[in-house]
Amino acid sequence: MEDFVRQCFNPMIVELAEKAMKEYGEDPKIETNKFAAICTHLEVCFMYSDFHFIDERGESTIIESGDPNALLKHRFEIIEGRDRTMAWTVVNSICNTTGVEKPKFLPDLYDYKENRFIEIGVTRREVHTYYLEKANKIKSEKTHIHIFSFTGEEMATKADYTLDEESRARIKTRLFTIRQEMASRGLWDSFVSPREAKRQLKKDLKSQGLCAGLPTKVSHLISPALKNLEPMWMDSNRTAALRASFLKCRKK
């Protein structure tokens, strides 16, 4: 699974996921299903934001990669992927500027057009089940919820899907592709089933000679990214700016 993740996802996504896991004492090389889930959720958040801008009239517009529109404002502020301190700083700044209610939990995005925080979910189960779980946890009508599944289903607060159909189809296609690629490598069953994942983890640890003296139970600490999912491509023009904002790269 680790090899698949590194081959399948943008290097920046992988780096952000590794950073989030290590912050909570989790090892991406061992908890590989969690690694894949975090990467998937991060990429969906970035894809949700890609190419969506607000023009000088305050209207939402879609600008494909390569068009020189530096003066346009990005419609979505990406909160997911930042360390917790910076993420809350961004949230507080948005609340102070816009007057919106501060959420109890860190959301994934902020929509400057609709003036609301957005919680993104990516589920391997039925979308309505996961939607209800997330809604019960957040307990706030102010935060908009949008759930995607690997089967092409989606569910959103008041059936308001925020994005145009083409943008959502791009996300669904990417999720379906990830599922197909996992299945072709024999990884999908363990990704979906916790029992199968635990069996595979024990097998991997044994093959690496790491079982002796180590608990086989996986850590229950939850990474910030994993809190927003259960357990795709990016706008290349935005990658450099995001990297500068989200990561402090070490010189090798």
From Swiss-Prot:
Pfam families: Flu_PA (PF00603). The keyword Calcium does not apply. GO terms for molecular function: RNA binding. The record marks R195, K198, R199 as: Important for efficient shutoff activity and nuclear localization. Its main location: host cell. Keywords: Decay of host mRNAs by virus, Eukaryotic host gene expression shutoff by virus, Host cytoplasm, Host gene expression shutoff by virus, Host mRNA suppression by virus, Host nucleus, Host-virus interaction. The keyword Methyltransferase does not apply. InterPro entries: PA/PA-X, PA/PA-X_sf. The active site is at E80, D108. It comes from the Viruses. Gene3D superfamilies: Influenza RNA-dependent RNA polymerase subunit PA, endonuclease domain. One of its GO terms (biological process) is viral RNA genome replication. It is found in: Host cytoplasm; Host nucleus. The record marks K202, K203, K206 as: Important for efficient shutoff activity. Plays a major role in the shutoff of the host protein expression by cleaving mRNAs probably via an endonuclease activity. This host shutoff allows the virus to escape from the host antiviral response. Hijacks host RNA splicing machinery to selectively target host RNAs containing introns for destruction. This may explain the preferential degradation of RNAs that have undergone co- or post-transcriptional processing. Belongs to the influenza viruses PA-X family. The probable endonuclease active site in the N-terminus and the basic amino acid cluster in the C-terminus are important for the shutoff activity. The C-terminus acts as a nuclear localization signal. The C-terminus is recruited to host protein complexes involved in nuclear Pol II RNA processing. This is Protein PA-X. It comes from Influenza A virus (strain A/Goose/Guangdong/1/1996 H5N1 genotype Gs/Gd).
